[in-house]
Swiss-Prot record:
Its cofactor is FAD. Homotetramer. Interacts with the heterodimeric electron transfer flavoprotein ETF. The active site is at 401 (proton acceptor). FAD binds at residues 158-167, 191-193, 306-308, 316-317, 374-378, 402-405. It catalyses: a medium-chain 2,3-saturated fatty acyl-CoA + oxidized [electron-transfer flavoprotein] + H(+) = a medium-chain (2E)-enoyl-CoA + reduced [electron-transfer flavoprotein]; pentanoyl-CoA + oxidized [electron-transfer flavoprotein] + H(+) = (2E)-pentenoyl-CoA + reduced [electron-transfer flavoprotein]; hexanoyl-CoA + oxidized [electron-transfer flavoprotein] + H(+) = (2E)-hexenoyl-CoA + reduced [electron-transfer flavoprotein]; octanoyl-CoA + oxidized [electron-transfer flavoprotein] + H(+) = (2E)-octenoyl-CoA + reduced [electron-transfer flavoprotein]. Octanoyl-CoA binds at residues 167, 216, 278, 281, 349, 351, 401. Medium-chain specific acyl-CoA dehydrogenase is one of the acyl-CoA dehydrogenases that catalyze the first step of mitochondrial fatty acid beta-oxidation, an aerobic process breaking down fatty acids into acetyl-CoA and allowing the production of energy from fats. The modification N6-succinyllysine is found at residues 69, 179, 212, 217, 259, 271. It comes from Bos taurus. The modification Phosphothreonine is found at residue 351. The keyword Flavoprotein applies. This is Medium-chain specific acyl-CoA dehydrogenase, mitochondrial.
């Protein structure tokens, strides 16, 4: 284990000449709100960004099309990301992790998504699965389930969505019945990213049998090990985009979970599940920006090479204006996720900004992918060119971790509350 740890650090230093695990300081967490405004990254942030960019462009991009075609889970790339310190960045230092802030994680997410959002989603899904344990787990739970992920490249999953309960989280039917020192869990989950690869799950289940019980008291959050008897993992789903990520349904049949695996206590699950999103939505928005930036870059490169009507595409005002609009949207979306990340790292409630970032970045990722296909013309509709994959990959950003419509409900609620104050 120690040898592996040292070898991982050596690989990272060889790329960026920086030892994350020994020299990390919580810059974002130490910054006082209002202490000064700056767009300058710290040297550490620049190093993380450079490492992620190098990995994405030299190792992910050359393999992305093949993984998209086969749907194979990108195990070698995930192991490599883990070796480079680009996975599990939220894990606290007390558990052997880097303890990075959300802003730092966003910088990494954007760069990885530029290479392939399928690969990036497989990596980032770990953060979503870990976050309930990070924000609500006790020391024993954190060291047991987060600590092991710093020792080897293990995966976990956020197990909440059900076949008839997506956006309506309060409508989930999976039940947890307490019997002695255990809970017996029965139910079905759906669209679980990393579902077939996870070592353990964060599971949300109804523990109060009263159907009228409020969501804030009716649900409990559990840590469930994937090899527990009664856990039945479904087939890998064939999705429109992000095909190399692992998405499955999971059935829980008389699954026994010890009370020690309850997060905080009975009835606290809904708040934990929702609270995780304030920290995970900014990196999802950042990933959408990474895809949008890739679409802009591919379209710009093509417009500088392709000739029509006797001149380059870029020399046609209609194309140049379209590229200008695309560039504007990328920059605005990037600022939105950075604001959301800065807010939560500064200790502020960032629900409003996180939803704005998630909604806007998801929308512009779809718009820019479509615009890139349009600039490529017929070539853009063909798998020999990269932009058709971007268009397929982009759609999920308007769906997972809260749909575009749910984000607007949250934004409206938060906005009205602010106005009334």
């Amino acid at each position: 284990m120690i040898a592996l740890f040292r070898r991982s650090c050596g690989v990272l230093r060889s790329l960026s000449h920086f030892d994350w695990r020994s020299q990390h300081t919580k810059t974002a967490l130490q910054r006082e709100p209002g202490s000064g405004f700056s767009f300058e990254f710290t040297e550490q942030q620049k190093e993380f960004q450079a490492t992620a960019r190098k990995f994405a462009r030299e190792e992910i991009i050359p393999l992305a099309a093949e993984y998209d075609k086969t749907g194979e889970y990108p195990v070698p790339l995930i192991k490599r990301a883990w070796e480079l310190g680009l996975m599990n960045t939220h894990i606290p230092e007390s558990c052997g992790g880097l303890g990075l802030g959300t802003f730092d994680s966003c910088l990494i997410s954007e760069e990885l998504a530029y290479g392939c959002t399928g690969v990036q989603t497989a990596i980032e899904a770990n953060s979503l699965g870990q976050m309930p344990v990070i924000i609500a787990g006790n020391d024993q739970q954190q060291k047991k389930y987060l600590g092991r992920m710093t020792e080897e490249p293990l995966m976990c999953a956020y197990c909440v969505t059900e076949p008839v309960a997506g956006s309506d989280v309060a409508g989930i039917k999976t039940k947890a019945e307490k019997k002695g020192d255990e809970y017996i869990i029965n139910g079905q989950k759906m669209w679980i990213t990393n579902g077939g690869k996870a070592n353990w799950y964060f599971l949300l289940a109804r523990s109060d049998p009263d159907p009228k019980a409020p969501a804030s008291k009716a649900f409990t959050g559990f840590i469930v090990e994937a090899d527990t008897p009664g856990v039945q993992i479904g087939r890998k789903e064939l999705n429109m985009g992000q095909r190399c990520s692992d998405t499955r349904g999971i059935v829980f049949e008389d699954v026994r979970v010890p009370k020690e695996n309850v997060l905080i206590g009975e009835g606290a699950g809904f708040k934990i599940a929702m609270g995780a999103f304030d920290k995970t939505r900014p990196p999802v928005a950042a990933a959408a920006v990474g895809l949008a930036q890739r679409a802009l870059d591919e379209a710009t490169k093509y417009a500088l090479e392709r000739k029509t009507f006797g001149k380059l595409l870029i020399e046609h005002q209609g194309i140049s204006f379209l590229l200008a609009e695309m560039a504007m949207k990328v920059e605005l979306a990037r600022l939105s996720y950075q604001r959301a990340a800065w807010e939560v790292d500064s200790g502020r409630r960032n629900t409003y900004y996180a939803s704005i970032a998630k909604a806007y970045a998801g929308d512009i990722a779809n718009q820019l992918a479509s615009d890139a296909v349009q600039i490529f013309g017929g070539n853009g509709f063909n798998t020999e060119y990269p932009v058709e994959k971007l268009m397929r990959d982009a759609k999920i950003y308007q769906i997972y971790e809260g749909t575009a419509q749910i984000q607007r409900l949250i934004i409206a609620r938060e906005h009205i509350g602010r106005y009334k104050k």
